[in-house]
Amino acid sequence: MKNKVLLCINTLKSGASILGNDVKVYLETKYFVEVVLIDVGRPLFSFPKENFLFLITLGGDGTVLLAVNLLLENENIDIPIISINMGNVGFLADIKIEDFKKVIDRFFNNSLVINKKFLLHVTVSQHGKDLISKYALNDIIIRSSVLNKMIYVDLMVNSESFLSYKSDGIIVSTPTGSTGYSFSAGGPILEADLEGFXLTPISPHSVYNRSFVFSKLSKLSISFSKEYFIAAASIFLDGINFGSFGVDVVFEFKISSQSLNFVSFCTDTFVKRLKNKLL
């Protein structure tokens, strides 16, 4: 039986199909592996329940997040992730197109450098019963299911009552996700290897409107204030809507003991990459 490689491409990206074929041919002819191709730019109805040597993504950071969601949903998170950038910013997809052969060669020569990226875990419970238990690489967002409605939430840290927010939503982000939506909402940028996570309100209408950074040992609990009523709130994990919930639910956040294995090929420091991509 041949070894298999999972190749996730976003055909909505110009040139992705052509590059995908080049990668596929290179793997099949030089290393005699079977390439399983998935187009994350189109609806996916099934995920191959197989073991893969590694995952390659062709696209931007959005493509990486879609592919990661597939891995997380199918509990297949141990394989190395090679993310080739066809987008703009490229914090997650940071391998240049012209380097894809070198990276593949390094895998088969056992000379890859792996960066562990923390996962954020959330549990949504109602009356003590867990409704969902999910992981995110970038961020988890809670916002009203009704357009133009604010949410009123109470925050607890390690089972201790802390403060309340009135805002358009709440972003809980990992260091990986701190350069995305959280940053746009005024949140802090966390160094990639920092063992912690951040909470940032979206357009807060509260007297206290600042973000917080918590250690990996902290556990956050968010519930809806009993003083104000909203019909429902939605939760988004890495941009994907995982449903709406009534106001009697509790959201619990913590850094997971599990992580994802991203292949590193960039020699730039975090500060240099940040300067080049954001500033």
Curated annotation (Swiss-Prot):
Q: Cross-referenced SUPFAM superfamilies, in alphabetical order?
A: NAD kinase/diacylglycerol kinase-like
Keyword ATP-binding attributed = yes
Family annotation (Pfam families): NAD_kinase (PF01513), NAD_kinase_C (PF20143)
Q: Which GO terms describe its biological process?
A: NAD metabolic process; NADP biosynthetic process
Gene3D superfamilies, per the entry: Probable inorganic polyphosphate/atp-NAD kinase, domain 1, Probable inorganic polyphosphate/atp-NAD kinase, domain 2
Which GO molecular function annotations are given, in alphabetical order?
ATP binding; metal ion binding; NAD binding; NAD+ kinase activity
Which cofactor is essential here? a divalent metal cation
HAMAP family per record: NAD_kinase (MF_00361)
State the protein's purpose. Answer: Involved in the regulation of the intracellular balance of NAD and NADP, and is a key enzyme in the biosynthesis of NADP. Catalyzes specifically the phosphorylation on 2'-hydroxyl of the adenosine moiety of NAD to yield NADP.
- Indicate what this protein is called per its UniProt record: NAD kinase
Origin species: Borreliella burgdorferi (strain ATCC 35210 / DSM 4680 / CIP 102532 / B31)
